[in-house]
């Protein structure tokens, strides 16, 4: 089992990132590119677009619920059927609640090291976000997650040998740096 398989696992996301199902991977990449292009270059606004999609979905669901027996063999699920203890929506809200609780515990200040790390990461994300939009960052992450594993799988030996050489060079530079730093005279301690 290769390193990429160990990292990604063997689920649907791994199949998508490794292009095992070329049609779904291609559709995902093309749709993400079109969505990014629409919002970034065509200057469409996200909230009106989401509201339009929501209105369209509500209209389709309404027509399906009222006239579903005529056009479809299956009726949509009722609200009572969706209100199940194992509902995906409840799982999503539970996960969001867990993340918010974790942030609250960090902000409460019991672990100062974790608090400072969180502040540092948020500041880094803030600085990156002031130059690049969130949508562009998410698009770059998607494209990288769909291309880097495939390129690594194809050129694994070449990349591993190159990274080995880079690691050796880094270790050599660290040794030279330690030698240079050791030659710098130390100031006497003042009491």
Curated annotation (Swiss-Prot):
It is a multi-pass membrane protein. GO terms for biological process: response to bacterium. It comes from the Eukaryota. InterPro entries: Reticulon (IPR003388), Reticulon-like (IPR045064). Keywords: Endoplasmic reticulum, Membrane, Transmembrane, Transmembrane helix. The keyword Cytoplasm does not apply. Its main location: endoplasmic reticulum. Residues 13-191 form the Reticulon domain. The keyword Membrane applies. It is found in: Endoplasmic reticulum membrane. The chain crosses the membrane at residues 23-43, 47-67, 122-142. One of its GO terms (cellular component) is endoplasmic reticulum membrane. This is Reticulon-like protein B15.
């Amino acid at each position: 089992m290769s390193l990429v398989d160990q990292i990604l696992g063997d689920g649907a996301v791994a199949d998508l990132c490794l292009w095992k199902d070329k049609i779904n991977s291609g559709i995902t990449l093309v749709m993400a590119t079109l969505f990014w292009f629409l919002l970034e270059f065509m200057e469409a606004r996200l909230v009106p677009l989401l509201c339009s999609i929501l209105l369209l979905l509500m209209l389709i669901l309404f027509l399906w619920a009222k006239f579903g027996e005529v056009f479809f063999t299956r009726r949509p699920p009722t609200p009572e059927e969706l209100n199940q203890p194992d509902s995906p929506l409840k799982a999503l809200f539970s996960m969001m609640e867990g993340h918010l609780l974790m942030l609250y515990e960090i902000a409460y200040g019991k672990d100062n090291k974790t608090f400072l790390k969180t502040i540092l990461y948020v500041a880094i994300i803030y600085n990156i976000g002031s130059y690049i939009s969130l949508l562009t960052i998410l698009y770059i992450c998607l494209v990288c997650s769909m291309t880097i594993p495939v390129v690594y799988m194809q050129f694994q030996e070449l990349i591993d040998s190159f990274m080995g050489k880079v690691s050796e060079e880094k270790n050599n530079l660290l040794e030279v740096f330690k030698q240079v730093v050791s030659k710098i005279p130390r100031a006497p301690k003042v009491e």
